[in-house]
Structure formats: C-alpha cells, structure tokens
Design a protein with these regions (language model features):
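Basic, polyanion-binding surface patches
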Residues: 1-192
Length: 192
C-alpha cells in the first residue's frame, strides 16, 4: 500500500462533535460547537475542550470557570452545525435552534450532559485548552436498559471529520472481546 507524505496536521479522526454550553456572571448564555475535546484523566474525572480565544464563549468560560459538554446526536446535527458557524454575539442560539436549557446550562435535548469546572487553561497557540474536572453527569433515562446500563450506541451519536458530520451507533465489540475465550463469550450470551 502506497502512502503520501503530508505536512504535519491533526489527523485524529473522527472526533466527537459536542455542544458546549456556558454562561457569564451577567446571565448571558451561549452554546459553542467543539470538536477538540476528550478525556484527560479517570480519577479524578477530567476532560478538556480547546477553544479559540476570539470565540464569544471563550471569555464566558474563562470568567465563570464552568461549562457543560453536551453530547450530540443525529437529531441535533443541524443545531450542532449552526452553533459552530454562528456567533452568540449576533444571535441567540438557544432560541434559533429551539433548544431547552436546564440548570447549569445543560442542554435538555442531549442524551448526556457533562458538567465541568475549569482547573487550568493551557495557552497552546490557535486554541487554548480548558482542562476541567467533571462535577456531574446527567444521562437521559430513555437510553437506560432494564438493568440500568446506559446504551450509548442507541443515541445516534454524532461525530465530525474533515468538515463532515457522521452518524455513529453500530456496536462492534466490547472492551477485551479480542482476548476472551470462546467459552466466556458463550456463557455471557447464556449458552452452554
């Protein structure tokens, strides 16, 4: 297989396309679409988002020290795109996209809301990374199975890659499935 050499760039794709909600001390609220996001640490639970300093939400997050990562779905694709290309300086994104906010600016329509408190801001270049501790997680009960397990694969999650939004959802394995013995797999499925 032949490969081309490209200039250095971020090729870690696909990425989650999340809607980050925040507010300032004056009561203004905004939603920002972010693809530069992920897990930093398990214990304590920490995440990050990277935002350009010129974005309207940047100073809200910097001032309040808080934000909410709202996972997006295929049903939220249009709103996710809108909140990434329109500025909260010019338009009320909540109103324009017919979105509902609950406490702490959590997006009601999102299957998962991850409430975060900023611990550190790393000024890296074009984007500044907000390192944050997770203070609460809300999960939509509609996606809980009979055992109370959250079935994220049924939410129709949205991903982003090179300017395109992609739907996710098909489960192809579970953690450790590649090394489990066949007898363990049969037992788990209820076969002997």
């Amino acid at each position: 297989m032949a490969k081309q050499i490209w200039k250095p760039g971020n090729m870690v794709y696909p990425l989650p396309a999340v809607m980050v909600s925040t507010g300032d001390k004056k009561g203004n609220q905004n939603i920002l679409t972010v693809a530069w996001t992920g897990t930093v640490c398990t214990n304590p639970a920490m995440v990050y988002i990277s935002v350009r300093p010129e974005r309207y939400s940047y100073h809200m997050i910097e001032e309040s020290g808080e934000f909410v990562i709202n996972l997006t779905t295929e049903k939220l694709a249009r709103a996710t795109d809108f909140c990434g290309v329109r500025s909260g300086r010019d338009v009320d994104k909540w109103k324009e996209c017919h979105l509902s906010a609950k406490k702490a600016q959590t997006l009601e329509e999102a299957p998962v809301n991850i409430e975060c408190k900023v611990k550190k801001i790393e000024k890296l270049g074009s984007h500044h990374m907000f390192l944050a501790e997770v203070t609460a997680v809300q999960a939509d009960e509609a996606y809980l199975n009979e055992k109370g397990k959250f079935e994220l694969n049924k939410t129709g999650l949205l991903a982003y890659s090179h300017g395109e939004y992609l739907g996710l959802g098909k489960k192809i394995g579970t953690f450790g499935y590649s090394v489990k013995k066949k007898s363990d797999r049969r037992r788990k499925r209820g076969k002997k």
